[in-house]
Amino acid sequence: MQHYKALFTLGIPIVIGQIGVIILGFADTLMIGHHSTNELAAASFVNNMFTLAIIFATGFSYGLTPIVGSLFGRGETHVVGRMLKNSLFANTLLAVLLTLIMWILYLNIHRLGQPEELLPLMRPYFIVLLISLLFVLLFNGFKQFADGITDTRVSMWILLAGNVMNIIGNYILIYGKLGMPEMGLLGAGISTLASRIMMVVVFAVIFFCTRRYHIYKEGFLHNALNRADFLHLNKLGWPIAMQMGMETASFSLSAIMVGWIGTTALAAHQVMLAISQICFMMYYGMGAPVAVRVSNFRGQNDRINVRRSAYAGFHIMLFIALIGALPIFLLRNELGGWFSDSPAVSVMVAQLIIPFIIYQFGDGLQINFANALRGIADVKPMMYIAFIAYFLISLPAGYFFGFIMDWGIIGIWMAFPFGLTTAGILYYLRFNRDTK
């Protein structure tokens, strides 16, 4: 029972923070969808492109967690601050690289087969989110440091505050309240940028100007950037980034295929992504402490508790899958109407709930054992597994079901269970082999 208790103690603040992200996603989709269906469709496409970049960057920042977790497990707190400094530097360089890549995508957005009427809505929203990318990566660096030392509450409160700020900003700027102009989708982007800047500033103030992290601040301030640490972070971070990036690409690239079907399908796809965030973020919230606990026990060379922590995490994932998916299934005919005034969107959302329910087991399985593998720093094989599961299975299956079998958007979504479950099984087999 100690493992379940420890995972819940670490995980619940992360889950609460992620619920804040979910509420923000719901609020964004609700407010944009009721302002304009075209804006909802434009937001769907742009958000999918940025989700790919942000998840890739988040995966890279995860390279810090097993390092900090192992150092913390051994009591080497003096090294942790130095690792954070190198992590923030590495994240900044990655932000520059991703910004250049996304800028190239922006210049070619008209070549991606999206509806012409959506392009004037997509472009300004895209630029504002592009500016915010650096702040996402800096926050990730601070958050993974805090998670690695088992201090998950600070991130929770900052995330919740940022989300409240974003929702209020959305309401004011999308609809033009309190004397502000009615900006629609662009207003949602500006609100997102402001909240992301605020979250980084608050975390930096807590780290540098309070005593909460003073033992780590000394290592941060009194050590220069270190080539060995930088390379170590990259060695762990890039495979995780590739693994998470390919997983997200199976959704983001699917959005391009959905765009070929039309504006209604894109709007339904965005609604389903907002709904799917409920279970995904809860899995993520409980998966992060699996990586932390596993890395702590790995630092102590305690293989038995490494395994017990991972399997306890999987049991929790199964429980979350049940309590998360059941109410969504029961409300499937009502959910679409919460997000859009279009009856066609509502009908399509109800149909997409079925493949969504099917892939919950595979999603929980792959998130849990991906985090367990991160905790033991066995990350390179995950990259190859992700390529097989998402690029060789999920994306081709989506095209086959969606267009060759002519199932449309339902066919595209029916491919996700195949990719996620394949990844989950292969991650489990790898972890089981590593820890025998």
Regions found by a protein language model. Give the residues of each.
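Small-residue hotspots at the loop-to-helix junctions and early N-terminal turns
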Residues: 37-48, 122, 126, 189, ...
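N-terminal transmembrane alpha-helices
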Residues: 2-30, 34-35, 51-63, 67, ...
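Transmembrane alpha-helix boundary and packing residues in multipass membrane permease domains
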Residues: 14, 18, 29-30, 66, ...
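Helix-terminus/linker motif at the lipid-water interface of multi-pass membrane proteins
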Residues: 19, 23-41, 109-116, 172-185, ...
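Short alpha-helical transmembrane segments in multi-pass integral membrane proteins
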Residues: 1-14, 68-134, 180-238, 294-359, ...
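Short runs within selected transmembrane alpha-helices of multi-pass transporters and secretion channels
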Residues: 61, 129-147, 155-163, 188-203, ...
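Small-residue-rich hydrophobic transmembrane alpha-helices
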Residues: 40-103, 136-155, 255, 268-330, ...
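Transmembrane helical elements of multi-pass membrane transporters/channels
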Residues: 9-28, 128, 139, 162, ...
